[in-house]
Amino acid sequence: MANRKLKIRDLTLRDGQQSLFATRLSQAEIDKLLPYYENAGFYIMEVWGGAVPDSVMRYLDESPWTRLRTISETMKGKSLLSALSRGRNLFGYKPYPDFVLKGFYEEAIKNGLNVMRIFDALNDIDNVKESIKLINGLGGIADGAVCYTVDPKYVPTTHTETIEKKSFFGLIKKTETIE
């Protein structure tokens, strides 16, 4: 245990701007921030997810692929790049067919994404299963997430059962978990 090292996942470029600025940081503004990140030593930087791809296109008239590629080229592998996905819904609000998931994940990995953190708000295994399989199969790292709340009607076994289901389906293996 003496060799253990603290690894930090930074969410600023995804959740920080999403929560504070309605995901409206332009590419020019992101570019000004990247030199500070380059040598920060973050294990993972979560740079996409939620509303990022939609907002970048809809409100800023920019390409989310250019954003991802620019961040990747600046970081030069110093930090893994991550996105938060709603599983079968990707970054939208409706489920997409497998061929859309596959094409999207191929493009994301090609443009520099390393890790896809995947969740379903209702912990429905069927909504995350295909995404996890695709990301792993395309050479990315699937990072399965479980949603939980602190409430008397939700006991800890509810959440551990969900995790066990993901393991049972072969979606998560201990050797694939991110430390």
Where are these regions (language model features)?
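Short catalytic helix/loop segments, enriched in acidic residues and glycine
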Residues: S26-Y37
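Short glycine-rich or small-residue beta-strand-to-loop segments that form or flank ligand, phosphate
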Residues: L13, L20, V115-F119
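Basic/polar N-terminal segments that are highly enriched at the extreme N-terminus
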Residues: M1-R4, E164
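Acidic, glycine/proline-rich low-complexity segments that act as flexible tails and inter-domain linkers
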Residues: A2, D10, R14-D15, T23
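Short, basic, glycine/proline-bearing loop/turn elements
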Residues: Q17-L20, A51
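Conserved, mostly hydrophobic/aromatic
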Residues: I8, G16, Y37, I118
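Active-site beta->alpha loop and helix N-cap motifs at the rims of alpha/beta catalytic domains
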Residues: I44, G49-E179
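Short, polar loop/linker segments at the starts of domains and inter-domain junctions
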Residues: S19-Q27
